[in-house]
Every structure is written in structure tokens, then in C-alpha cells.
């Protein structure tokens, strides 16, 4: 269930359960596991039960070094094992995501362009966009355009490009030759179920003065 929940995180490629089954009930070196599976990160966990109480220990590890990125323990009532399992899965996936994102962004910031994939360029674009400084919007735009060069099917790249142009248009920092609304609409067509694309589209509408569309 946790594998399923983590696979819903847009920027993650998660190793299938059958690939990890060989390590069940074993204590292999995390670095070897990561190398065998081609994984950048490894999630490790254990369950202990005492009476009606159950404790889940989870840790997120960096594959190459085995370094801890995040760890937490969860306690619950074991009377309804399915309910507590669902609670654990939801909590772990929700709390792990920002730590994974921060780690991935920091990794992407250390890469040269030649080493980057489209997702790395998107991490760089979002990092600059989220700083909300005038100069950073231009840099975010450049990274979004680079992501589009690498993979024009990335809806989020078009959304970031659109919102950066919309902000720059509002700030009158640069002549805008492309329509931010059209770029945002292209993003939604490519990634209709991406909440971040829809959120950025709302910002584009807001900058265009269409508050009704922004709120929808």
C-alpha cells in the first residue's frame, strides 16, 4: 500500500513491490540495495506489536551513502489492523514527500545542464519561482524553457513558463511575445490531473484580471 501511495507523487519513479520482495526478512546493506535496484532513495521500515498496540518505524535513506534523510515512528491501536494500516500509509506518504522534494531540489541545484533530465530542470525552475523575487522569475522562466527543450510533454514546464511570463508582464519587466493564458491552457491539456499545474493556471488567470476563472 505504501508503494502505491508513493507512486502517486508526481516526481517519483517507485520500484515495483516484486523487485523488492527478495529483501524481505533480511538486513542487507542499503547501499547495495540501492545499487541493485538503481534507486536513489530507499525506504526502510519495521513493525512491532505489544498487546493491542502497534508501532511502525520508518526511515528514508539516501541510496549511495546510506545517510538518513528522514525518520519517524507511528503508534496506533492494532484492534482494526486495516484502519491503522491506511492511517500509517497516508501519514508516511504525506510526511515523507516534502523531505524527498527538498532533497531532490538540492540535488538538482548541484547538477550541470549536461547532467540534467527534464525533472531536474523543473526542480530548478520551481525553486526560483518560489523565491518570488523579480530576478528569480526570469531565471525560473529560463529553466522552464530548458525543461521544455528536454521534454515538451511536461505540462508543469509550460505552466511555470506561463506564470513567469504573466508575472513579468504585470511587473512590466520584459516585453511578452507569448500569451501566458495559452501556455497555461497547454499545460492543463498535457497534465489535466496535476494540481500544481492547475494552481499555477489560477495565478495566470489572476494576473490577467480574471478572478472568477482563477477561483474555479
Residue ranges and their predicted role:
Residues 1-139:
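Catalytic-center loop of serine/cysteine hydrolases
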Residues 136-142, 170-186, 207-216:
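Structural signature of tandem alpha-helical TPR/SEL1-like repeats
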Amino acid at each position: 500500500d505504501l508503494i502505491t501511495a508513493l507512486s502517486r507523487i508526481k516526481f517519483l519513479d517507485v520500484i515495483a513491490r516484486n523487485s523488492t520482495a527478495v529483501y524481505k526478512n533480511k538486513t542487507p546493506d542499503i547501499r547495495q540495495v540501492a545499487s541493485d535496484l538503481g534507486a536513489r532513495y530507499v525506504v526502510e521500515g519495521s513493525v512491532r506489536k505489544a498487546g493491542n498496540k502497534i508501532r511502525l518505524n520508518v526511515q528514508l535513506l539516501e541510496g549511495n551513502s546510506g545517510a538518513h534523510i528522514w525518520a519517524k515512528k507511528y503508534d496506533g491501536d492494532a484492534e482494526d489492523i486495516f484502519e491503522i494500516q491506511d492511517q500509517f500509509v497516508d501519514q508516511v506518504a504525506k510526511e515523507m514527500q516534502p523531505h524527498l522534494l527538498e532533497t531532490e531540489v538540492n540535488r538538482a541545484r548541484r547538477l550541470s545542464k549536461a547532467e540534467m533530465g527534464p525533472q531536474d530542470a523543473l526542480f530548478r525552475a520551481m525553486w526560483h519561482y518560489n523565491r518570488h523575487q523579480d530576478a528569480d522569475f526570469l531565471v525560473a522562466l529560463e529553466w522552464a524553457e530548458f525543461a521544455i527543450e528536454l521534454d515538451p510533454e511536461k505540462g508543469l514546464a509550460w505552466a511555470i513558463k506561463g506564470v513567469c511570463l504573466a508575472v513579468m508582464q504585470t511587473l512590466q519587466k520584459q516585453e511578452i511575445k507569448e500569451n501566458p493564458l495559452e501556455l497555461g491552457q497547454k499545460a492543463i491539456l498535457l497534465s489535466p490531473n496535476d494540481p500544481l499545474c492547475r494552481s499555477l493556471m489560477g495565478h495566470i488567470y489572476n494576473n490577467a484580471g480574471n478572478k472568477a476563472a482563477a477561483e474555479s
